Amino acid sequence: MSWYSFGNDRSLLILKLYVQPGARQTEAVGICGEELKIKLAALPVDGKANRALTEFLAKRFNVPRKNITLKRGEQSRHKVVEVCQSSNGPEVLFSEMRAE
């Protein structure tokens, strides 16, 4: 099983994420088991970490925030997120890691 999968028509990308809030910067850091680990600069207070996550994903996938849906894990570090209608694949999350 992978940390991502596609819906039936490939316009839906489903991501399994492990989120670490309170980091120095927001970034994807690598695979952790069957999830992609993402560090968030935001703290997990009043939904700020979830908002930071959706903003990060929307920017990476070049879609509006409304196309990012948190399906599971609103109050957990383990999350399932759906990305709708992105022309980018899951590899865009690693673009910053390769640049370093």
From Swiss-Prot:
Record-linked Pfam families: DUF167
SUPFAM superfamilies on file: YggU-like (SSF69786)
SMART domains in alphabetical order: DUF167
Segments forming a coiled coil: none
GO cellular component: cytoplasm
NCBIfam families xrefs: DUF167 family protein
Family to which this protein belongs: Belongs to the UPF0235 family.
Name this protein carries in UniProt: UPF0235 protein NE0395
Lineage: Bacteria, Pseudomonadati, Pseudomonadota, Betaproteobacteria, Nitrosomonadales
